[in-house]
Amino acid sequence: MSAPTLPQETETAPAVASAVPGGSSAKTWSVGTLTYTTGGLILLVVLLLAGDFAWSMRERSVFPLFQVLLRKYEASDLLSSLLLGSIPACLTVLIWPVVSVWSDRTRSRWGRRIPFLFLPTPLVAGAMVGLAYSPQIGVWLQQLLGGTGNPKLYILSVFGLFWILFEVFAMVTNSVFYGLVNDTVPRVLIGRFYALFRMASLGAGVYFNYSLIGYAESHAKEVFLVIAAFYLVGFSLMCRFVKEGTYPPPPPVVQNDTFFAKIGRYFRECGHHRFYRLTFVTLSLASLAPVAVNLFSLYAAKSYGIETDKYGKYLALSYICSFVISFPLGWLADRYHPMRVASTCMAIYALTMVAGFFWVHDASTFAVFFIAHTVLSGCYGTASMGLYPMVFPQAQFGQFFSAYSLLFNFLVFGASPVLGYVLDLSGNWYLLVFAISGGVGVATVVLWVFWYRQFQAGGGVKGFVPPAPLEARE
């Protein structure tokens, strides 16, 4: 058998199997123009998981660090919801569709995804360095402008600036990362691969919340700097060594097309079929369900007397539970289809959150339902990861995935400040977040029934084929 190699492109390396003793052929896996031996597949998985671990350390750490610092400098719930929810959602609406379609159409020597992952990476790390030094910059800015008194307004302003820069650059990588997986991982392994992805992400979450979050208030600068360096090195190495295949030419560009004509065509292509419209709404509601608890769980914990370090331990415990069940969930998704497994997980999550609204009354019961929230929403996330490549057309995966993300973030953009305002009016009655997440989950399950009927009409779990893109139908 040949030595472990990265995938070979079938146009330049026609052989798809390596000889093994006894005259048989080694098993291979293919996706697009890429063909993997066992060794090549293992190497791909290791590289992608290493990149995902670095990416997850960024995703799992920066958000809670920023939450802690916003509370430390006395940001209101409304301001927190704007910075943590609405502004990132607005940026997603503006950036994600443009970058994803641009990536779908890109043809370069490095592929169509890697350039959009590698180039923003140092900028993301730089924004994290800016967040690390925001308190010092805020104090310096106050002195420069001749301000007096508490510098928290200046510090929060600098935090907001670097947070927005961080979100802009991170959004570019987020918009195409799953596209890289879609283009390089064989379909027959997608459920188990995403389970491994989930395990890497959870491992990053366990490490951060068990070991580092307790230092968020006292050593935030050092934590930011370490994570920035780790992300810069780890994600860059993945971009350097993962190889994409070759792609067919993109559809021709319409000459003299105006900006608004391009927007109109984007929405026509994504929404031309009822199945896709139901897909976008159902998946967006499913992703929206945990948002209320996610945004305010740390503040809710503090309202029950739970300190940041203990909150981190609860979060780490929930990630350990999720880690243990991730691969079995991936196997179940491959065996019974992500459509079935993900909907079951969402139904259980919705009922549990509704129960939490009625039963949480002290620190212990909050801990139980908070851990349940994290584990069950994670179960849905793990089970649904393999669903996206199955319900969106592969050639335009980035575009269709961005349409789902656009709708989801539009909902977050509108809902986050309303939620923050309601919590401010209620006197910070954080128990409401369980009712809201549970209610959105119930609505998702109801809508999923209609979506599943459309899915069955298109071939179901045995032979579903995504409806043809509009250009193919025309």
Pin down the residues of each PLM region:
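Juxtamembrane intracellular "pre-TM" segments in multi-pass secondary transporters
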Residues: 16-40, 247-279, 466-474
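Helix-loop boundary and gating motifs at the non-cytosolic
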Residues: 23-91, 275-304
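Intracellular juxtamembrane helix-capping segments at the cytosolic ends
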Residues: 66, 172-185, 379-393
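Glycine-rich segments within core transmembrane alpha-helices of 12-TM secondary carriers
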Residues: 88-93, 191-213, 405-416
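Helix-to-loop junctions at the C-terminal end of transmembrane segments
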Residues: 94-110, 216, 325-338, 423-424
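A membrane-interface helix-boundary motif in multi-pass transporters
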Residues: 112-115, 149-150, 214-229, 421-441
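Structural signature of the two symmetry-related core transmembrane helices
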Residues: 113-130, 340-355
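Multi-pass alpha-helical transporter architecture, strongest
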Residues: 131-138, 233-242, 437-469
